């Protein structure tokens, strides 16, 4: 029992180390210091925070949807990272990076962890509007805005982190690696949007609970439709 409590405390200690001293944390990743401990701690903490937020947005429909979203939201972020990691790693290696895939994985997890912390910090706001604003489209758009804000912040951290980690690599190919990173960030966003659409529903609509919906339409048309309904165009 004491050992489990110690492990839980250790996980959050690692996360707080990232939040309080991001530069020092990234320097340790660049040097390959305690990578397994960092990876496990960030995975555990971010999964827990995403699960809490997922449960809140899913509770707009039913307890089953809350449970489903609590599971699917952490899976969404982790699967997006895993799908895009090989592209960033191998292209970077091809153009002079000397870092291991574990270092890239740890650096990407810092971004995911930052996103999870921001969403967790905004969870009371989402819960407040869930209770007081009984409008499905408004709640969806509010959370899309939260996802966009936290995602942009996380991607900014990621861009800075990967640039920092690669600063001592082959300088001749630095400009090329920067272009690859920018391209990869666009790819990461596109994969994330499509995967999120594939794993839906996270919120749930009126009717019976379903784990997954049929593949139809796309994320962007759905957002436009939600805006139109909120403004009374439909």
Report the location of each language-model feature.
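A glycine-rich, hydrophobic loop/mini-helix early in the fold
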Residues: 37-104
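Long, intrinsically disordered, low-complexity regulatory segments adjacent to structured domains
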Residues: 180-184, 188-234
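Juxtamembrane loop-helix boundary motifs flanking transmembrane segments in multi-pass membrane proteins
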Residues: 3, 7-14, 18-22, 27, ...
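Amphipathic, well-ordered alpha-helical segments in soluble domains
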Residues: 18-21, 51, 86-87, 154-157
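Membrane-interface helix-boundary motifs at transmembrane edges
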Residues: 30-36, 64, 168-175
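N-terminal juxtamembrane cytosolic/stromal segments of multi-pass membrane proteins
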Residues: 1-42, 222-234
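Hydrophobic alpha-helical transmembrane segments and adjacent short intramembrane/lumenal linkers
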Residues: 71-75, 88-204
């Amino acid at each position: 029992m004491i050992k489990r409590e110690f492990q839980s405390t250790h996980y959050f200690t690692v996360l707080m180390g990232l939040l309080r001293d991001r530069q020092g944390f990234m320097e340790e990743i660049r040097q390959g210091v305690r990578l397994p401990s960092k990876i496990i701690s960030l995975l555990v903490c971010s999964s827990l925070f995403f699960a809490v937020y997922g449960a809140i947005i899913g509770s707009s429909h039913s307890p089953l949807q809350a449970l489903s979203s609590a599971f699917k939201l952490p899976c969404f972020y982790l699967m997006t990272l895993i799908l895009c990691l090989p592209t960033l790693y191998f292209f970077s290696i091809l153009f002079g990076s000397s870092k291991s895939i574990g270092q890239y994985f740890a650096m990407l997890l810092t971004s995911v962890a930052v996103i999870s912390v921001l969403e967790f910090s905004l969870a009371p706001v989402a819960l407040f509007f869930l209770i007081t604003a009984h409008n499905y489209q408004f709640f969806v758009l509010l959370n899309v805005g939260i996802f966009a804000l936290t995602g942009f912040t996380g991607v900014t951290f990621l861009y800075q982190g990967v640039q920092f980690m690669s600063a001592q690599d082959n300088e001749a190919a630095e400009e090329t690696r920067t272009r690859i990173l920018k391209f990869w960030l666009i790819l990461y966003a596109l994969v994330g949007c499509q995967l999120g659409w594939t794993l839906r529903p996270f919120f749930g609509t009126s009717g019976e609970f379903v784990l997954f919906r049929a593949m139809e339409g796309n994320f962007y048309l759905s957002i436009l439709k939600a805006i139109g309904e909120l403004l009374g165009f439909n």
